[in-house]
């Protein structure tokens, strides 16, 4: 169970880190913004799966 807790904490940190990076993307760099949004969506999906598994 400790491994899942560690993995969950790391996933939460990764989501927060990507959210912060997305906030400071230059307005003229749409390609970077799209890439960060896709990565953030994937990280959020992974976080949701980990939370569901952790609660089970």
Predicted regions and their residues:
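Short, charge/polar-rich alpha-helical segments
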Residues: 1-13, 28, 35
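Non-transmembrane amphipathic alpha-helical segments
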Residues: 11-25, 43, 47-50
